[in-house]
Amino acid sequence: MNDEQMAEIMPLIMYGGEAKSSAIEAIQAAKLGDFEKADERLDAANQAIISAHHGQTNLLTQAASGEAVSVSIYMVHAQDHLMTGIAFVDLAREIIDLYKVIKKY
């Protein structure tokens, strides 16, 4: 793995973790009835996912063009962070919707 690939992998880890943290903050805000903050944190989580996807797309493009992209524990870890972040954002949306329904009653 070269330095350029490592520089592309690290943001996946960072943005994936940021998405997960923001999604948890969104759930916590909704639990307290602060749906404006919940939406704000979900937006931040979505932006982190988008940023991570840009890095992932670059790596996929390199591989698709025939460039050697070595799979390392860092790359596996990065993909894990990204997928976990995506899962948390998806679940956060559903949980926030449930809190909104509960708050009505």
For the regions a protein language model found, what residue spans apply to each?
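Terminal alpha-helical segments
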Residues: 1-105
